[in-house]
């Protein structure tokens, strides 16, 4: 039987011979990590066995290079991967750690379910509950919260989640709300944000979910992002960087001149609405910016304007100045999420 694919996506990998960092399509399997030069490649460029390997995160071997994790194999070979942002790295770290633990214990990898262990009523459909929580009108309101000189965008508080469950009569009391919330967390419908909730979720606290206004959580597809506050009040950000970050990640972008496709890290901001793109392997300055106010964004099934690059999951942004940008997501779901987020941003601010 083929090993199960646990997680896949773009990460930047450090070369093992030369000190170069390049974006790779990385696939986490139950027994190892495969990395490909392109998502469409049939055979991997390399494979890292996980049996006996150790994981180091955060890895601070490279100074300014953020969100790096290190895997050391039994042969003492180090492999370094860099994620686009903190939450992406944390998600990879959680799954790699769990895969290594499952190999050690001779178990199959499975997303942890607390339904049986906490005697959750069979009548509760966590998927349906999640959709109710995300309802724009009746669901939980996402907040921008500040703590320890960090701003947490699009997040929820532990006590806020339980308040909502109680007020909507979905649970009889806060204790029952705590059980349901722990299940939502373990099934991946909620993610921990910030040290307090992460430590609890990792098993340091008695309950993996905390009924506290200081414990922060977020929906996995909400555009959550945590950013450091500048302590220097004299720093005036350029206008286009003032907006709140609502989504980020890697996409393929077609060049305007040569029409070739390259992996780029994208950061979407609203009010003012800008989409900045970067070389994912380095450099803090963007390669370019797309002003989204009044733009049109649509999915593209096939187009003579698009030089063929495995034509699935393409979408196009046409700016108010009629500049065309062609982008490609890794999956249909990811394409839909980006289109929706860009449409929302394009209607805000300047």
From Swiss-Prot:
Residue(s) carrying Phosphoserine: 113, 117
Matching SUPFAM superfamilies: PH domain-like, Winged helix' DNA-binding domain
Keyword Secreted: no
Statement: the UniProt record of this protein carries the keyword tRNA-binding: no
Keyword terms of this UniProt record: Acetylation, Phosphoprotein, Repeat
Pfam families associated with the record: DEP, PH
Regions that span the bilayer: none
GO molecular-function terms, A-Z: phosphatidylinositol-3,4-bisphosphate binding; protein homodimerization activity; protein kinase C binding
Residue ranges occupied by any DEP domain in the UniProt entry: 136-221
InterPro entries per UniProt: DEP_dom, PH-like_dom_sf, PH_domain, Pleckstrin, PLEK_DEP, WH-like_DNA-bd_sf, WH_DNA-bd_sf
SMART domains in the record: DEP, PH
N6-acetyllysine: modified positions: 64
One GO term describing the cellular component: ruffle membrane
Residue span(s) of domain PH: 4-101, 244-347
GO biological process, one term: protein secretion by platelet
Disulfide bond annotation, renumbered to this chain: none
Function: Major protein kinase C substrate of platelets.
Protein's name in the database: Pleckstrin
Top-level taxonomy: Eukaryota, Metazoa, Chordata, Craniata, Vertebrata
Gene name as annotated: Plek
